[in-house]
Amino acid sequence: MARLNPNRRTRGLAILETALILPLLFVLVMGVIEYGWLFFKNQQVSAAARTACRFGITAPATTAETLAMCDTLMTKANLGSSGYTKTSTPCEVLAGTSVTVTITVPYSNIKLTGFPLPLPTNLVGTTTMAKEGPP
């Protein structure tokens, strides 16, 4: 009777376990990377909206200058070609009146991995601040 080598059997089992677990590990790693990218880009969009709104509430700023500041900030964040939209309430208002800047970026245009995960369709950064200046 031939004796079976126990090492050979264990080696085959390890390959089988690796083949079953490796795809799950790959999906987990890709999900972590994609969600990290999502949070990073969402922070950039929110920061751009906040900075543009801060610019818009200063006394001599106009709505057109505020929207141009959005373009500058989005280009600096490497989101200039992402197909984003920007809106601003009029900046030529009295002191104390609120000014709102909103930037919306379609997430499908800035995906990192393209891996099919449940992700939001848009990243939205909205900031509202009161207009500065003498009352």
Model features per residue range: what roles?
Residues 13, 30, 38:
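Catalytic tyrosine of NAD(P)H-dependent dehydrogenase/reductases that use a Tyr as the general acid/base
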Residues 1-11:
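N-terminal leader/signal peptides at the extreme start of proteins
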Residues 2-3, 42, 50-135:
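Short, conserved structural patches
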Residues 11-24, 35:
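N-terminal signal-anchor/signal peptide hydrophobic helix marking the start
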Residues 10-14, 26, 64-67, 121:
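Alpha-helical membrane and juxtamembrane elements of multi-pass inner-membrane transport
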Residues 21-23, 27, 31, 52:
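Small-residue faces within membrane-embedded alpha-helices
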Residues 34-45, 59:
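Membrane-proximal amphipathic alpha-helices
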